[in-house]
């Protein structure tokens, strides 16, 4: 290993920058090319600005999924009003007395 020159900046030390440029390839060799390639390609971490993906618009002749649903009124669910007396009676009738006493 070469000795580090104290007069040089850290980014100019030998071995701090790879001899070849970074590529867009995602093979194993290119993923371990340098620290930046490892973070971006190997781990999938990038700190740059994210590009906004545009949604693909539907072709003009196609119908949206909302047009296919027929308009129907929502039905109200009917519930039987049960009071506390009814539920207690049902529980008492279903329960058996303890035979182990």
Curated annotation (Swiss-Prot):
Predominant localisation class: host cell
Domain of life from the UniProt record: Viruses
Gene3D superfamilies: Tat domain
Name of the coding gene: tat
Cross-link (Glycyl lysine isopeptide (Lys-Gly) (interchain with G-Cter in ubiquitin)), chain numbering: 71
Region (Cysteine-rich): 22-37
Ranges of biased composition (kind: Basic and acidic residues): 82-101
Positions of the UniProt region annotated as Core: 38-48
InterPro entries attached to this UniProt entry: IV_Tat, Tat_dom_sf
Lineage, highest ranks first: Viruses, Riboviria, Pararnavirae, Artverviricota, Revtraviricetes
Family assignment from sequence similarity: Belongs to the lentiviruses Tat family.
Record: residues binding Zn(2+) 2: 25, 27, 30
Ranges for region Interaction with human CREBBP: 1-24
Keywords associated with the record: Acetylation, Activator, AIDS, Apoptosis, Host cytoplasm, Host nucleus, Host-virus interaction, Inhibition of host innate immune response by virus, Inhibition of host interferon signaling pathway by virus, Interferon antiviral system evasion, Isopeptide bond, Metal-binding, Methylation, Modulation of host chromatin by virus, Modulation of host PP1 activity by virus, Phosphoprotein, RNA-binding, Secreted, Transcription, Transcription regulation, Ubl conjugation, Viral immunoevasion, Zinc
Modified residues (Asymmetric dimethylarginine): 52-53
Function comment: Transcriptional activator that increases RNA Pol II processivity, thereby increasing the level of full-length viral transcripts. Recognizes a hairpin structure at the 5'-LTR of the nascent viral mRNAs referred to as the transactivation responsive RNA element (TAR) and recruits the cyclin T1-CDK9 complex (P-TEFb complex) that will in turn hyperphosphorylate the RNA polymerase II to allow efficient elongation. The CDK9 component of P-TEFb and other Tat-activated kinases hyperphosphorylate the C-terminus of RNA Pol II that becomes stabilized and much more processive. Extracellular circulating Tat can be endocytosed by surrounding uninfected cells via the binding to several surface receptors such as CD26, CXCR4, heparan sulfate proteoglycans (HSPG) or LDLR. Neurons are rarely infected, but they internalize Tat via their LDLR. Through its interaction with nuclear HATs, Tat is potentially able to control the acetylation-dependent cellular gene expression. Modulates the expression of many cellular genes involved in cell survival, proliferation or in coding for cytokines or cytokine receptors. Tat plays a role in T-cell and neurons apoptosis.
Protein name: Protein Tat
Region of interest (Disordered), residue spans: 48-101
Intervals of motif Nuclear localization signal, RNA-binding (TAR), and protein transduction: 49-57
């Amino acid at each position: 290993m070469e000795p580090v020159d104290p007069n040089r900046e850290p980014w100019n030390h030998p071995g701090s920058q790879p001899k070849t440029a970074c590529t867009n390839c995602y093979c194993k060799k290119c993923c371990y090319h340098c620290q930046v390639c490892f973070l971006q390609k190997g781990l999938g971490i990038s700190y740059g600005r994210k590009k906004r993906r545009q949604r693909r618009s539907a072709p003009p002749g196609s119908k949206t999924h909302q047009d296919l649903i027929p308009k129907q009124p929502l039905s109200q669910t009917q519930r039987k009003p049960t009071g506390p007396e009814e539920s207690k009676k049902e529980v008492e009738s279903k329960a058996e007395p303890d035979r182990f006493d």
